[in-house]
Curated annotation (Swiss-Prot):
Keyword terms of this UniProt record: Membrane, mRNA transport, Nuclear pore complex, Nucleus, Protein transport, Repeat, Translocation, Transport
Naturally occurring in which organism (per UniProt): Chaetomium thermophilum (strain DSM 1495 / CBS 144.50 / IMI 039719)
Single Gene Ontology BP annotation: intracellular transport
Protein name: Nucleoporin NUP152
Gene: NUP152
InterPro entries recorded: NPC_Nucleoporin, Nucleoporin_FG_rpt, PH-like_dom_sf, Ran_bind_dom
Lineage: Eukaryota, Fungi, Dikarya, Ascomycota, Pezizomycotina
Keyword Repeat on entry: yes
Compositional bias of kind Polar residues: 32-42, 81-92, 144-155, 175-191, 367-378, 416-472, 651-664, 673-689, 720-746, 777-789, 814-828, 840-863, 900-923, 940-961, 968-987, 998-1029, 1037-1055, 1179-1199
Length: 1463
């Protein structure tokens, strides 16, 4: 027989969980449960399977323990699994001796055959061993003895179960083998490898202890009998309907509702289905557990099981929620979701304190309202943040506390009662709101307190206050040590022990309630964290409590004897101000605010000055005010006493409350008061309006004398009798003529609007950073400096330099240079305060940074040059520098700024403009406009004077002026023509600008007229006159003026040596070396010094060539003759004696020349005199190298001349650029293509042939002539473009159809010669080719429709160069369709180029479909040309018009050249 099989289960106790029993159903009280019956707690469980314990198998050969041995062993209670009900199983003895189903009886009452913990509950009396016989009604007797031992060695004592003990007979399972696993592994060891081997004692002892003490709990109280046993988990799992679309779990009530008895109510029905689902869960768990073979995480598996079971019970409403305290994170999230403050939980249960001790730094630094308003018990005081308790106290510590020698007694206390709690006193005083007649003066938030001396640290300024105030850092301060032995729970005793004066302030016993609980945390402060211990003269620590107002208040020294009565009640209330000022220290931001009348309570965050004991004893008396301390933000808090105190320095220097008599504290940015010598950072402080003079400014006895003044950061200094210290950023010198200080200095705002005060006439002007002054006589310069003018005050210079200068006062220089002036002068007025970036109070006006300044009267003795040169000008000549960008009214001798116009004679450091010839000798600003006598700025427009130079790019209006480089000017005979501007025909044209008349020399950037003086030629341009230098880019005026570096000078008769590259006049004058502008030459003087590279004529010039002053196109032929202007950047005047740019040729033929050789003496020998190696065409005259105006005689090695120049098929000549066609019409190669040429109408040329009616040739020709107006365009980088996308003539046309095609033309014998020079880019047809068709080009074929006329033409540009292969009108008389034999071809007729006759063409496309589409497009658009048959081609009309325009321009140029030559 097979070894006994058994089925292991997951949470089995003695047996597997949830086994179906055969006992009839019985009452819940009859505690016998079936292991298969699913409790209400257990999820649906695996179906009950027959189990047999290998250890108890009768076939096991192992020796069993005797009955006596088993009886003496310890009986271990049945283990409890995740579900106590489900983990209980039924013993075999209960099954064998079970009463009737109707009579419930406890299972333990049938002890006949003993069941061991390892026994299989399905065995009948432990006698049937095989699974096949287990479930039979009458199983056979076992073959061996029925003794059964468990691994634990103890008989089982089954517990009552809520399920019935009936076990219905089931068919035997198909298999007989199960895993060798204990049926209750939670409490017993695993079975050994040998099925019958008993467990060892060690294993028994260890494993039996695991879950033996687990208490069983019912999942829910049963209201129904146990469901039928046959409804096992396995059967229920099989009953689940198969639904592939089901998502989620399915429950028993959804598909097993028919199994529920109809008499059940809702609760019973839910319990019934819950038990069924728990059985199904148990079955599923067992299946998983068995299949995994113990290789799963048992803890996670158990958690998942419990989770599933709980979900089932929750589904049926049977889950009993446990009272588990939620975690802080869960509570916080829940509160946040429901909008509940986080402090609600803490207020309900205040944290328990440990009676004091050192507190952690992060503990309750901010007060909470809940800590003030709630106490857990009447004996406990709520923990307040301000509580000064520091250590644990015992109840009997009060006696010890009273005996302490250093303990301070309550002032005025008749008995030695201990000092009350500071926190309690504060809360009670706030609740009572008993304001004393004398309250602490109200102060602004940033006002400084009155302190006799500065404290060393901002943390040391928190002074000791009376017991009415507490410190939020009280646990760190000495105030908390005063109550070392007090208990947190002793507040009632404290309340009783306090004096009547204190008790009348209290409303609550425990001090926890407050009228303003949220403010209580902010209303207390005591000793500083760094000043915790105060020691007396003997070195013993002195216990002192904070006194006075909250966070401040006058502190007074106390002796160890009983102290005197407290001064006024300085308790803070909700209406009180807050003072953060630190006593005695300089304010960083320095606005000192006088104290208002003491009408409200104040929280003073600065320590007050220490008072004498007798002073502190006077409660109704206001505290004496000492020297005011400097506030961090500078609001000075001033008291209402008559005794004024010196003002503290405010860093930002705005002082308020002008009604006070005390002197305001100096602000860092404020103007200093007369007596206060401390300077503000930005230096303007505003004193109170009603300040008295020096007798009232004296401090009281308690106040020390004011310290010497410190300079402000940005330096507006008050006028004091003592010499002020220098400013931090002061760039100006201090005022030498300081007078008696005014009582109220005016404050210059940071951006220059100072607050207005009542006595403006008494305030000195301070310089503001941006130099805008308030509308007062005594003003400070604002940073950007629009300052108000006064009659006689010194004006501060603004950075950008608009100043209003008074008559006779020294001006203070502002950073941006606008100075403010003061109204009155007097011995008692302070001078202007030094500005941070250079405003001075000296009598000498200084220049503004950009500074156009108004001229000052003659009293100003010195002008300081601003950074950019705007100055305040005075009558003193030649001392002012000009502002960089600003314009100044010009006194005759002022220095000009770099970019601004000024009126001084001093030249700026970097002068870019030429100086005028006027007697004022003023320099012109680079960009600015100046007065009429000034020289013109480089880029600016100036007013017109006859001697003025024109700006480089600006326009001018005078006839004698030189024209700007790029600007357009009025057309007069003597003006230059701009490069791009239109000028009159009589003017010479410079390269980029308007050229002057013929009397002036043309320069690249300007005009240099020739003079008679012997000056060495400039290396780059025409020489200037003898006395002046030329500016770098500007044009120089008359002979007394400096000449620009590249500019032209007026023409004189001076002798100049020939320049290196330059054009020289034909007189004895020499041309400048490297001339960028051609000079006007006179034909009367033939003797010229030869240039190093060529003739005396400026052969290497970059300006207009010839006498007409126009720019010659280096690549275009001149209209008068066919010789091209080879590389002409500007033709010079024609001379007979000049040689082309040669490296040493004298009068003979140059051996190596870059230009055309000129041989005026023998014009007939041009062929012999041609240069050996010439880059340009030879010429018979001495024209410049880059601009030849005469016909050449020598051939060019790079340009073979071809015969028909510009000839078209119609016989009309057309002008094309010189580099495209040859100039030698007599060349022998006229009918051939020259591959090595820069000119000539060969097939390699980049423009269409003459026979093509494409207007691009005409456009190119016109553009070649128009190059004179845009010579620099030749040097611009060219973008990479597609040459086939479009070209000239297509601007007014739209593409109606486009396809890539090949144009093929039928060429006859008569046409072959005419087509030899076509522009299609194709070679002529070879003789050997017998085909009459010639491919003209492949590329995009476009049907173009004119936007105005509507004419439609076919245009095909051959790839890759874009030359015209096909350009024909669509004839409406023909039908366009693909050829029948070759569907990719469309054959059509078109008019010839000369209009005589027709031609046959074919267009080949890639596919027949494309051919169909092209034919359809041609048919569609040919109607537009029906009325156009007799008209000329539109393109030819454009060509003719452009040719006419070109001819007109050439004639115009010739006339201008003749006029220039005559001049």
């Amino acid at each position: 027989m097979d070894p006994p099989s058994k089925k292991r289960s997951i949470f089995g106790g003695i047996t597997s969980l949830f086994r179906s029993s055969t006992a009839p159903p019985e009452d819940r009280k009859g505690k016998s449960t079936n292991s298969n019956s699913v409790t209400a707690n257990a999820p649906s469980l695996p179906p009950p399977q027959p189990e047999s314990n290998g250890a108890s198998s009768p076939f096991s050969p192992a020796k069993r323990a005797s009955e006596a041995q088993l009886s003496v062993r310890k009986i271990i209670p049945k283990p409890q699994g995740p579900s106590s009900k489900l983990s209980q199983s039924v013993s075999a003895s209960e099954i064998a001796h079970r009463p009737a189903p109707s009579t419930p009886a406890p299972a333990a009452a049938t002890p006949v055959p003993k069941r061991r913990p390892g026994d299989n509950p399905h065995k009948l009396a432990a006698s049937t061993s095989t699974p096949a016989l287990q479930n039979l009604p009458n199983p056979p007797a076992p073959a061996t003895s029925s003794k059964a031992t468990s691994f634990s060695g103890a008989p089982s004592t089954p517990r009552p179960s809520i399920f019935r003990n009936s076990l219905y007979a089931r068919p035997a399972p198909a298999t007989t083998y199960t895993q060798r696993v204990s049926s209750h592994p939670l409490t017993q060891s695993f079975p050994p490898v040998t099925p019958g081997r008993p467990g060892r004692a060690a294993n028994v002892d260890i494993n039996n202890r695991i879950l033996s003490n687990t208490a069983s709990t019912e999942l829910f109280p049963m209201k129904i009998p146990e469901p039928p046993r046959h409804l096992t988990g396995e059967m229920l799992a099989k009953e689940v309907p198969e639904d592939p679309n089901r998502a989620g779990s399915i429950y028993a009530d959804e598909y097993l509702a028919h199994l529920c008895p109809p008499e059940f109510d809702d609760l019973q029905r839910r319990q019934f289905f819950c038990i069924l689902d728990l059985r199904r869960l148990k079955y599923a768990a067992d299946e998983v557990f068995l299949k995994k073979d113990w290789k799963i995480n048992i803890l996670n598996f158990a958690k998942e099981y419990e989770k599933s079971r709980s979900l089932i019970m929750l589904r049926y409403g049977l889950y009993e929620f446990k009272t588990v305290r939620a975690s802080e994170a869960v509570k916080r999230e829940w509160k946040l979701k429901h909008g509940i403050p986080d402090s609600d939980d803490e207020s309900g249960a205040p944290a328990k304190t440990n009676g004091g001790g050192k507190r952690k730094a992060e503990e309750d630094l901010e007060p909470s309202s809940s800590t003030f308003t709630h106490t857990a018990s009447p004996n406990k005081r709520a923990r307040a943040t301000e509580a000064p308790a520091t250590n644990k106290r015992k109840a009997n510590d009060e006696l010890e506390e009273e005996s302490q020698p250093s303990k301070l007694q309550k002032p005025g206390s008749p008995s030695p009662a201990k000092t009350p709690s500071a926190t309690k006193s504060v809360f009670e005083s706030i609740a009572n709101k008993t304001a004393s007649p004398q309250t602490a003066p109200k102060s602004s938030l940033f006002s400084s307190s009155t302190a006799a001396k500065p404290n060393g640290s901002i943390f040391d300024n928190a002074q000791k206050t009376p017991a009415t105030s507490s410190n939020i850092f009280g646990h760190l301060s000495d105030a908390s040590k005063d109550e070392d032995n007090e208990s947190d729970t002793g507040s009632e005793a404290e309340a009783e022990d306090e004096t009547p004066a204190k008790k009348k302030k209290k409303t609550t016993v425990n001090g926890a309630s407050s009228s303003a609980p949220s403010e209580g945390g902010e209303s207390t402060q005591s000793r500083s964290i760094f000043d915790r211990i105060t020691r007396d003269a003997n070195g013993q620590p002195v216990r002192q409590l904070p006194e006075g107002g909250l966070f401040s208040g006058e502190s007074r020294k106390r002796s160890l004897s009983p102290v005197k009565e407290l001064p006024a009640n300085n308790t803070w209330n909700a209406s009180a101000g807050i003072k953060f000022a630190t006593p005695g220290t300089s304010s960083i931001f320095g606005s000192s605010n006088p104290k208002p009348p003491a009408t409200t309570d104040t929280i003073d965050f600065a320590a007050s000055t220490t008072k004498k004991p007798e002073e502190a004893a006077a409660p109704a008396e206001a505290p004496k005010e000492a020297t005011p301390t400097t506030n961090l933000f500078g609001a000075q808090t001033k008291a209402t006493e008559e005794a004024p105190k010196p003002a503290a320095t405010n860093i930002f220097g705005s002082t308020t409350n002008p009604t006070e008599t005390s002197i305001p504290a100096g602000s860092l940015f404020s103007a200093k008061p007369a007596t206060s010598t401390t300077n503000s950072l930005f230096g303007a402080t505003t004193s109170a309006a009603g300040q008295k003079k020096d007798e009232e400014s004296k401090p009281t006895e308690a106040a020390p004398a004011p310290a010497p003044a410190t300079s402000t950061l940005f330096g507006a200094k008050p006028a004091t009798t003592e010499s002020p210290k220098t400013n931090l950023f002061q760039f100006g010198t201090p005022n030498k003529t300081e007078t008696a200080p005014a009582t109220q200095p005016q404050f210059g705002g940071l951006f220059g609007k100072p607050p207005s005060t009542e006595t403006p006439t008494e305030k000195p002007a301070t310089t503001s950073l941006f130099g805008t002054d308030a509308s007062k006589p005594a003003t400070t310069s604002s940073l950007f400096g629009s300052a108000t003018t006064a009659a006689d005050k010194p004006a501060a210079t603004n950075l950008f330099g608009s100043t209003t200068t008074p008559a006779d006062k020294p001006t203070t220089t502002n950073l941006f240079g606008s100075t403010s002036t003061q109204a009155t002068s007097g011995s008692d007025e302070p001078t202007a305060k030094k500005f941070a970036f250079g405003g001075t109070t000296e009598s000498k006006p200084t220049t503004s940074l950009f500074g156009s300044t108004t001229p000052a009267p003659a009293t100003s003795t010195e002008n300081k040059g601003g950074l950019f040169g705007a100055t305040t000008t005075s009558a003193t000549p030649a001392t002012n520098t000009k502002p960089l960008f600003g314009s100044t009214p010009a006194p005759a001798q002022e220095n000009k700024p770099l970019f601004g116009s000024s009126t001084t004679t001093a030249a700026p450091v970097f002068q870019f403009g030429s100086t005028p010839a006027s007697t004022s000798t003023e320099q012109k600003p680079l960009f600015g406009a100046t007065a009429a006598t000034d020289s013109k700025p480089l880029f600016g427009s100036t007013s017109a004077t006859s001697t003025e130079q024109k700006p480089l790019f600006g326009s001018s209006t005078t006839m004698t002026e030189q024209k700007p480089l790029f600007g357009s000017i009025s057309t007069t005979a003597t003006e230059q023509k701009p490069l791009f501007g239109s000028t009159s025909t009589t003017e010479a044209k410079p390269l980029f600008g308007a050229a002057p008349a013929s009397t002036e020399q043309k320069s690249l950037f300007g005009i240099t007229p020739s003079t008679t003086e012997n000056n060495p030629a400039s290396i780059f341009g025409n020489s200037s006159t003898s006395t002046e230098q030329k500016p770098l880019f500007g044009s120089a005026p008359a002979s007394t003026e400096q000449k620009p570096l590249f500019g032209s000078t007026p023409s004189t008769t001076e002798n100049k040596p020939a320049g290196l590259f330059g054009n020289t006049s034909t007189t004895s004058t020499s041309t400048p070396l490297f001339n960028f502008g051609s000079q006007n030459t006179t034909a009367s003087q033939p003797s010229t010094t030869g240039s190093i590279f060529g003739s005396a004529s400026a052969s290497f010039t970059f300006t207009a060539g010839g006498s007409d002053g126009t720019i010659k196109n280096p690549f275009a032929s001149d209209g008068s003759y066919s010789a091209p202007t080879s590389f002409n950047f500007g033709s010079g005047d024609s001379q007979s004696s000049s040689a082309p740019f040669t490296f040493g040729a004298g009068g003979g033929t140059p051996s190596f020349t870059f230009g055309a050789s000129s041989d005026s003496s023998n014009a007939s020998n041009n062929a012999s005199s041609a240069p050996i190696f010439s880059f340009g065409a030879s010429q018979p005259s001495s024209t410049p190298l880059f601009g030849q105006n005469n016909p050449p005689a020598a051939s060019n090695i790079f340009a073979s001349s071809l015969a028909p120049v510009g000839g078209t098929s119609t016989g009309t000549s057309k002008h094309v650029p010189s580099f495209l066609e040859s100039e030698n019409k007599a060349s022998a190669y006229s009918s051939l293509d020259s591959p090595f040429t820069f000119g000539g109408a060969s097939s390699l040329a980049t423009t269409p042939a003459a026979s093509t009616p494409e207007p691009s040739a005409a456009n190119a020709a016109a553009a070649g002539e128009d190059q004179g107006a845009s010579a620099d365009a030749d040097e611009q980088p060219q973008e990479q473009i597609s040459l086939t996308d479009g070209g000239p003539g297509e601007e007014d046309e739209s593409v109606v159809h486009e396809v890539r095609a090949k144009a093929v033309k039928l060429v006859t014998a008569a046409d072959s010669s005419a087509d030899s020079s076509n522009g299609s880019g194709e070679k002529p047809a070879e003789k050997k080719s017998n085909s009459p068709w010639k491919v003209m080009g492949v590329g995009p074929l476009r049907l173009l429709k004119h936007k105005q006329t509507g004419a439609v033409r076919m245009l095909l540009r051959a790839e890759p160069r874009g030359n015209i292969a096909l350009n024909k009108l669509v004839l409406p008389q023909f039908t366009y369709k693909p050829d029948a034999a070759t569907p990719k071809f469309i054959k059509f007729a078109a008019a010839r180029d000369d209009g005589k006759g027709l031609e046959t063409w074919m267009i080949q496309v890639k596919t027949p479909q494309l051919a169909q589409e092209l034919a359809a497009a041609l048919e569609e658009h040919k109607k537009a040309n029906e009325k156009k048959d007799g008209e000329k081609n539109e393109e030819s009309e454009k060509k003719d018009e452009k040719q006419e325009e070109k001819k007109n321009e050439e004639k115009k140029d010739e006339k201008e050249e003749k006029k220039d030559e005559k001049k």
